[in-house]
Regions:
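Intrinsically disordered, low-complexity Ser/Thr/Pro/Gly-rich regulatory segments
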Residues: 158-159, 163-179, 194, 203-205
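Active-site microenvironments that recognize anionic phosphate/pyrophosphate groups
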Residues: 1-161
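A long, hydrophobic alpha-helical segment
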Residues: 179-189
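Short C-terminal domain-edge/linker segments immediately following a structured domain
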Residues: 103-109, 169-170, 181-183
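Histidine-centered divalent-metal-coordination microenvironment in nucleic-acid enzymes
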Residues: 146-153, 188-205
Length: 205
């Protein structure tokens, strides 16, 4: 996370609707069409530069057919920036309670960021219920595929693959039938935010 990102993101957050206004407009549109609602929300996140379209354009995509005749696609994500040396040094000397707890927690919404911390002042998260639990829905700033979105538990709990995971995926698919949705592995060896915070991912393909 660079100082340029931390400085630029608040500037793109001046005109868009506030988080509460965003939720209100989104759910009004959901009453008519889930696809129109996500189209509006995605366009908002592109226009306020939370979804980094210019950076995403650098990604490399290989498409082809396997020996069995199945479609195959490999994506190399070149859009997500590496931490600069200052960010690494600042993170190494950080003390006290971690805030936000992880890159997916809801307190990232509106967070101004800093060295070693993601700039999220222009982040918008849609509040929703999945299988009776409060969850959130947002787009990934550095997408691997079209309209790459993240569904996350509003509570900071570790990811676990079980029967509830399948129930959640079905509930999400019913809510947004024009999107596909899947889940990461919950293997401890995978050192990423997908393990420390319960979530699923989806999008268009």
């Amino acid at each position: 996370v660079t100082s340029r990102e931390v400085q630029n993101d608040p500037l793109t957050d001046i005109a868009p609707p506030t988080p509460s206004e965003t939720n209100s407009i989104f759910w009004q549109k959901m009453e008519k069409s889930s696809e129109k609602a996500t189209d509006w929300f995605y366009k908002l996140c592109v226009n306020n530069n939370y979804v980094k379209k210019e950076a995403i354009a650098r990604n490399v995509v290989f498409s082809g057919t396997s020996s069995k005749g199945h479609g195959l696609e490999i994506t190399i994500n070149l859009s997500k920036p590496e931490k600069d040396p200052k960010a690494i040094a600042a993170a190494a000397h950080a003390t006290g309670k971690k805030y936000p707890q992880c890159a997916l927690c809801l307190e990232n919404e509106g967070y101004l960021g800093g060295y070693g911390k993601n700039a999220r002042s222009n982040l918008r998260i849609i509040r929703m219920n999945i299988a009776g639990r409060p969850w959130g829905f947002q787009y990934s700033p550095y997408a691997y595929f079209n309209e790459h979105c993240i569904f996350l538990d509003q509570k900071h709990i570790p990811m676990v693959i079980n029967q509830q995971t399948l129930i959640n995926l079905v509930e999400i698919e019913k809510t947004f039938p024009h999107y596909f949705v899947g889940s990461n592995a919950d293997l401890p060896i995978v050192r990423s935010s997908s393990v420390v915070h319960e979530r699923s991912q989806g999008g268009r393909h």
